[in-house]
A protein has these predicted regions:
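Short, acidic, metal-binding catalytic loop of nucleotide-sugar glycosyltransferases
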Residues: 27-35
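Short, polar loop motifs at secondary-structure junctions
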Residues: 42-48, 99-102
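Conserved hydrophobic/aromatic beta-strand scaffold that supports enzyme active sites
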Residues: 81, 152-154
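N-proximal low-complexity "stem/linker" segments adjacent to membrane-targeting elements
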Residues: 1-22
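A glycosyltransferase accessory/donor-loop signature
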Residues: 1-7, 40, 54-55, 140-152, ...
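Active-site-proximal specificity loops/subdomain of glycosyltransferases
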Residues: 46-85
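A short, conserved beta-to-alpha structural element at the edge of catalytic cores
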Residues: 117-140, 275, 283-285
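GT-A fold catalytic core of metal-dependent nucleotide-sugar glycosyltransferases
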Residues: 61, 74-127
């Protein structure tokens, strides 16, 4: 059974998601003992530098039309992962992530299910984030949706995954109608992949088959949204946590945020966190 990670890297404005995918791929090569493959999905106009391609397992052109062509926030193609993945077992990631610790042992646990959505995330201190608050997850709470994070989402090529991604496609293409009909207690104004995946799980009635809320260590990520970090009020200036918390980075396996060494897949969110110095350090660790 082949295994690997997958991301979509579509640049938007001055945000270089392809460079983030490169850093993610380097971090996987530097830290994972077994599964370190990363497939990167790009639109037809994206030119992938040769040094990037060397660390990507596969570069896949996003099939059919580019649903995100006219979108500033390039998430509209996120229903296509099932069709783009070259692996039997796949974990979907967000591009703005790095892996400081080895999570290869998670794969055998994840493979017990056909779908497994991350529903618990960590603060920078490694504590369980109290993200069942109203700040980021208001519409999940009000509509009793599973607390899905598509920044770490496992699927296996299977009948259940096929059915799931067919519904995900339908919701993506008709998201306003679905949100209006099936989220009576409030809905986001914009398309959200987390909401779409959660709604598909709810509509199919497969929450027990695809989530394990009481299991907080596998799978999980450190999620650097500012206001789930459980710090004293006023400690963060705004959503850019990097303005308030320092990072101490000498190598990927030991870097610290605010004096706490990172160990879980690290979703840095603030794109300015990934500096050229961090990328250079990753390159030196891999080559």
């Amino acid at each position: 059974m082949s295994r690997g990670y997958i991301v979509i890297a579509q640049n938007s404005g001055d945000t270089d998601y392809l460079k983030m995918a490169y850093a993610l791929a380097l971090s996987l090569k530097a830290t994972q003992s077994t599964v370190s493959n990363l497939t990167v999905c790009v639109d037809k106009d994206t030119k992938v530098p040769s040094k990037y391609a060397k660390v990507f397992d596969h570069v896949v052109e996003i099939p059919w039309q580019d649903d995100a062509k006219d979108s500033e926030w390039k998430i509209d193609n996120k229903w296509k992962y099932y069709y783009m993945s070259p692996y039997d077992e796949t974990v979907i990631l967000d591009t703005d992530m790095v892996f400081p610790g080895d999570v290869s042992h998670w794969w055998d646990i994840l493979s017990e299910k056909d779908l497994w959505a991350c529903t618990n995330v960590k603060t920078f201190r490694g504590e369980n984030a109290v993200d069942h608050n109203m700040y980021y997850r208001e519409y999940f709470i009000k509509n009793n949706l599973p607390n899905v994070y598509t920044a770490f989402f496992y699927f296996k090529k299977s009948d259940l995954a096929t059915e799931f991604f067919k519904l995900v496609e339908i919701i993506f293409q008709n998201w306003q109608r679905f949100f209006f009909k099936y989220m009576p207690n409030g809905k986001p104004d914009n398309l959200s992949a987390d909401v779409v995946y959660a709604l598909a799980i709810q509509l199919l009635g497969i929450e027990q088959e695809s989530t394990v809320d009481q299991l907080t260590e596998v799978p999980t990520i450190t999620h650097m949204k500012s206001f789930i970090q459980d710090v004293p009020s006023g400690s963060f200036l705004d959503e850019k946590w990097t303005l308030s918390l320092p990072t101490y980075f000498s190598d990927i396996k030991t870097f610290k945020v605010g004096n706490f060494q990172q160990q879980y897949p690290f979703h840095y969110v603030d794109k300015n966190w990934l500096t050229d110095d961090i990328i250079k350090s990753l390159e030196n660790e891999v080559t």
